[in-house]
């Protein structure tokens, strides 16, 4: 949790599937910059399972508990502060489920590199992994069922499935203002399939923002590269890498802040760090 002394809004952050357990570490630079700009940042960790509906409910409960604690401890006022959702990859899907299923009030959602693939594509060898996890249990069950000529469906999918997720968003998603960010070098991004679904509800409030970078750009940190006493070819490569990665990350940060506050006024602030519970 990052709390500036005079917060202007709250940002609830949810990360990707395999880094969502430690968002404060994986996304440290980006989240810290949001805190410096005056935003309370609540980064909610989660363990990935096939039941995305349950994860969405859990992270929402955790977020609401943290906000209540901050208000109780007077770290933030109990008055109105707008709340924004910020998600990366699977975190986007979770925010979309929260906005579709649980009637939350949000000033808007920022969805970075949205991913809604089925198990087989979202997780390398996902189908085989799921099969192996249940093989021992199913082996005995299948033997028993065979004598009754019953069959067992060994296909596994997220809950809700990609198709069910799209239907939920189309029919029940209640957050009208959205920023969709897609990176130029991201082969698993599905922002373009999400965009028309959201446009059906409030096209004038859906902002599409293509940016240079790849699926891992939000995880980047500013690279500190010190050259030696003599400038070498390795130093040249290091400086180029630092410049390229830093520019993509800083551009992402700038677009997020511009959308959050179009007036371009971002107050500098010291932030207090506290672990989320």
Predicted features and spans:
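Phosphate/oxyanion-binding active-site loops and adjacent basic polyanion-contact surfaces
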Residues: 22-26, 51-59, 248
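Short, surface-exposed basic-aromatic patches at helix termini and helix-loop junctions that form
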Residues: 31-37, 61, 100-105, 198-200
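Alpha/beta-hydrolase active-site loop
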Residues: 50-79
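Short acidic, S/G/P-rich loop/turn micro-motifs used as interaction or catalytic elements
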Residues: 17-20, 49, 91-92, 116-119, ...
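C-terminal catalytic-base region of ester-bond hydrolases, centering on the histidine
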Residues: 135, 139-142, 156-277
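Hydrophobic/aromatic beta-strand patches that form the interior of the parallel beta-sheet core
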Residues: 12, 42, 84-86, 108-110, ...
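Short, surface-exposed "cap/lid" segments of acyl-processing enzymes
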Residues: 1-48
């Amino acid at each position: 949790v990052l709390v500036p002394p005079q917060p202007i809004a709250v940002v609830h952050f949810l990360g990707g599937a395999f880094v969502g357990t430690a968002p404060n570490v994986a996304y440290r630079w980006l989240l810290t910059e949001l805190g410096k700009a005056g935003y309370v940042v609540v980064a909610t960790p989660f363990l990935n399972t096939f039941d995305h509906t349950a994860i969405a409910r859990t992270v929402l409960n955790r977020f609401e508990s943290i906000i209540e604690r901050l208000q109780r401890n007077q770290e933030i006022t109990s008055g109105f502060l707008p709340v924004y959702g910020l998600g990366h990859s699977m975190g986007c899907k979770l925010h979309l489920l929260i906005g579709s299923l649980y009637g939350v009030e949000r000033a808007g959602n920022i969805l970075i590199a949205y991913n809604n693939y089925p198990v087989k594509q979202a997780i390398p060898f996902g189908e085989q992994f799921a099969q192996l996890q249940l093989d021992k249990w199913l082996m005995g069950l299948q033997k028993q069922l065979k004598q009754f000529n019953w069959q067992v469906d060994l296909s596994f999918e997220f809950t809700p499935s990609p198709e069910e997720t799209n239907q939920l968003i189309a029919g029940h998603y209640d957050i009208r203002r959205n920023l969709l960010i897609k990176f130029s070098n991201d082969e698993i991004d599905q922002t373009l399939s999400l965009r028309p679904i959201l446009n059906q509800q409030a096209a004038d409030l859906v902002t599409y923002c293509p940016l240079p970078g790849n699926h891992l750009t939000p995880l980047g940190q500013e690279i500190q590269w010190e050259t030696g006493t003599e400038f070498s070819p390795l130093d040249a490569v290091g400086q180029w890498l630092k410049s390229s990665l830093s520019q993509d990350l800083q551009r992402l940060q700038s677009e997020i802040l511009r959308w959050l506050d179009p007036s371009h006024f971002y107050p500098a602030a010291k932030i207090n760090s506290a672990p989320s519970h």
